Swiss-Prot record:
GO terms for cellular component: endoplasmic reticulum; membrane. This is Membralin-like protein At1g60995. Residues 514-531 have a biased composition (Polar residues). Its main location: membrane. InterPro entries: Membralin. Residues 99-119, 506-567, 602-623 are annotated as: Disordered. Belongs to the membralin family. The chain crosses the membrane at residues 24-44, 315-335, 363-383, 392-412, 424-444. It is a multi-pass membrane protein. It holds the Pfam family Membralin. It is found in: Membrane.
């Protein structure tokens, strides 16, 4: 079974299942999702990484009086439309005997008080929404406000005219004798819509209250590792801080809902604590993750010279390139080797099943050969685990790279896809890793989701715009050839053999220096005649391959170009040794993202060919 033939069948089946409308809908849907996630990432990064919005809520807590600080996000009343600050918005927090209670107001930064009944109540009052007044966003905010006002004026104009038309229709119906006095609140009450709204809000609040994250912050890691008995014995106190999810530091209503249900509070709390305290350790009780906040996010402004900044950014770029090349090369090598063995195993298993031969030995040998790649994949995973310091993020990056490499192996056949798809993949991959390494406490998962959405749109774009039309033209051309020659079957092996022969002939011609306008070497004439004869009257692909091997044996190899050999000798030999004997053609295709090594006259697998005028004498043309 030929791998190319299998890939063509897979693409043909997918192109039949996914109609052009479905493909276009998926393409634009992923583009919309990617742009939306990118806008959310920009807003979140500007408000909570560059300028942490909730840092002012934690600066008043003096850790000199308490060694530990427990932070709780209360989400009561988040889905209700009441903007009033009530006592229900901030639930009571009961602390231990040796703990302190922090009470936050607009005028006071923090106060500590100890009651006689060993219970403490904390009240959190919301601050005005002036905490988001940032001079850098004034222009953007003004433009957005002007756009919203213009839209509001147009919508109000349409609504006014619609209301006038409805009032006129109502008067006409009243004159006729059919009253249309509709009481909307009464109608909603009759239809039980008010109860539906009430139950919906109550259900959302009950689901939201389940997600109330609690954090424990300390300046020294040893305080966190002590058991409760040791904490009480050594008089280690805990300050309880409660912040409402409706607090203005979390933005407007839509930002609050988005943070509570999608983004999460981890990154916001980490950046706020780092901006206020500068260092320490943070523990999340829900996810049981322990964060080290001692790593500086950027150099201080006083010591951040241009040289240090340049060295830092160059290090980030080199690290991103290292991760890119290591991950893609290992995944590509593993994928190509495993798919070759899987196809070979499938053919052998079909042969054994048809002839009723024992299959235990075949399956056992295939399993043993496949176990060789298990340590490779485990090594890749452990390398990414240590590199990202986050197992889930590393696994998601590996899955994303695996998906793109699988698309490259199966579908990328046209010249424009071969030229531009690896470059866009490199661009998206580098942008994500530059953001990840530049901001240690950034929104990494949101950035990865944005990158994944853009890469999925990239895959659908190239497959829908270039690969599927080329596949359809290839299938039509093959069907027309089968109709003209019923006894002649075009397989992907024949196409690949002729493609490699044409490519080798073109490279031999370019490496030779002609002595005249009509100068041809005997070897070239021999190759041309053999290919013409095979293309004109080929009846068996095996016979064609035998003739091709004989011609190659009689052909004098072309003189190598010393410049190209010197440019690729050392580096390519090292890469070939690392990859275990990979072919130079695969290396050239891998390096094609930086330089275009394919000319327009070289052949491709998918061809846009028309039926030849004289099929008995003209060679089989493969573009």
């Amino acid at each position: 079974m030929d791998p190319e033939q299998t890939f063509i069948r897979v693409q043909e089946r997918f192109s039949q299942i996914l109609t052009p409308r479905i493909r276009g809908f998926l393409e634009y849907t992923y583009l919309f999702v990617a742009i939306t996630l990118f806008c959310i990432l920009v807003v979140m990064h500007a408000n909570y990484v560059q300028q942490p919005g909730c840092s002012s809520e934690l600066t008043g807590v003096e850790l000199a009086e308490a060694e530990l600080m427990q932070i709780k996000i209360t989400s009561a009343g988040l889905w209700s439309r009441n903007d009033e600050s009530t006592a229900a918005d901030v639930p009571r927090v009961v602390a231990a005997t040796d703990s302190l209670e922090v009470s936050k107001t607009d005028q006071e930064s923090s106060t500590s008080e100890e009651n006689t009944d060993d219970t403490f109540v904390k009240i959190d009052k919301e601050e005005p929404r002036s905490s988001f007044s940032v001079s850098a966003k004034e222009n953007v905010r003004a433009a957005i406000l002007r756009f919203l006002k213009k839209c509001y004026r147009r919508i109000s104009f349409v609504l006014q005219h619609t209301a006038r038309i409805l009032r006129g229709v109502r008067k006409i119906w009243n004159i006729i004798g059919i009253p249309l006095n509709l009481d909307v609140p009464k109608l909603l009450h009759v239809l039980y819509m008010d109860k539906v709204n009430y139950y919906a809000v109550q259900w959302l609040e009950s689901k939201t209250q389940e997600f109330e994250p609690t954090y424990l912050y300390t300046m020294e890691k040893g305080y966190f590792l002590l058991p409760d008995e040791a904490k009480s014995r050594h008089n280690i106190r805990t300050a309880n801080v409660s912040i409402s999810a409706r607090h203005p530091c979390f933005g407007n209503r839509w930002q609050q809902l988005l943070i509570n249900r999608v983004v999460g509070y981890d990154t916001i709390i980490m950046n706020s604590l780092q901006n206020s305290a500068g260092q320490g350790y943070l523990y999340n009780y829900q996810t049981r993750e322990f964060y080290n906040l001692s790593y500086s996010q950027e150099l201080p402004d006083g010591s951040a010279h241009f040289g240090d900044y340049l060295v830092t950014k160059c290090g980030v770029l080199m690290m991103s390139l290292f991760v890119f090349f290591t991950t893609t090369m290992s995944v590509s090598f593993t994928l190509r080797e495993t798919q070759t063995r899987m196809l070979k195993f499938t053919v052998q298993l079909q042969h054994h099943a048809q002839h009723r031969l024992p299959t235990f030995q075949l399956i056992f040998v295939h399993v043993i050969e496949s176990l060789v790649f298990v340590p490779i994949m485990i090594g890749i995973l452990f390398f990414l685990f240590e590199f990202y310091d986050d197992q889930l993020l590393a696994f998601m990056v590996l899955v994303l790279v695996w998906l793109c490499e699988l698309f490259t192996l199966i579908s990328v056949r046209t010249p424009i896809s071969m030229k531009f798809f690896p470059r866009f993949f490199l661009l998206y991959f580098l942008v994500f890793h530059i953001y990840f390494f530049s901001y240690a406490y950034g929104f990494s998962y949101l950035a990865l989701m944005t990158t994944a959405a853009f890469m999925q749109h990239l895959i659908l774009y190239f497959w829908n715009r270039f690969e599927v039309p080329a596949l359809q033209r290839f299938l039509q051309s093959r069907q027309s050839h089968l109709q003209q020659h019923p006894d002649f079957h075009i397989t992907s092996s024949t196409i690949l053999a002729s493609t490699l022969h044409i490519t080798r002939l073109n490279r031999t011609t370019r490496n030779r220096t002609p002595s005249g306008p009509n100068h041809t070497t005997p070897n070239q004439n021999t190759e041309t005649r053999s290919f013409t004869a095979d293309g004109g009257g080929v009846g068996n692909p095996a016979q064609y391959q035998e003739q091709q091997e004989e011609n190659e044996a009689n052909t004098v190899p072309a003189e190598p170009n010393p410049q190209q050999a010197g440019a690729m000798s050392s580096f390519s030999s090292m890469l070939l040794w690392i990859l275990g004997g990979a072919s130079s053609e695969g290396l050239n295709s891998f390096l094609s993202m930086f330089r275009d090594v394919r000319d327009e006259d070289e052949a491709q697998v998918f061809a846009d060919t028309s039926p030849p005028q004289n099929p008995h004498h003209d060679p089989l043309s493969v573009d």
